[in-house]
Amino acid sequence: FASSIDRHTSALRLLHYPHVEPSSVASGQLRAGAHSDYGTLTLLRQDDAPGGLEVRGADDEWHQIPAEEGAYVVNIGDALERWTAGRWRSTLHRVQIPSPDSGPHERQSIAFFHNANWDAVIEVLGPCRPSDGEVAPPITAGRHLMERFLSTQRGE
């Protein structure tokens, strides 16, 4: 991958989720709705505030990911899933609002979103190619990101 990430277009984001008054929250409302990350990998450092990160497991259930001192959460992104023909799965995740009985809480996280070089070609790696040969067509990382941004903008 070295030649595909030596000019990466990554981003570091400081995420602040302010306290939400329970009376202003609709049933089932989330701080961040279910989504996957677009790039290759995401490294997340989260605080231990209630109402945190949840991931959807292979059992289709949502599982809380507790913050652990000194630990980072590593999420596989859509680009890496495409490079591996799904052998490594992109992580569907969301951020919950704390329950009303947990008191007032803000949430702070730091996320590093790693993306490949804008012109890197995302094409299924040979060892990951399925026996039936069916794979997504090659795409540049830049086009992949733009397609994902536009898809999100359209609400897809």
Feature map (PLM): residue ranges:
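C-terminal flanking tails of non-heme Fe-dependent oxygenases
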Residues: F1-E156
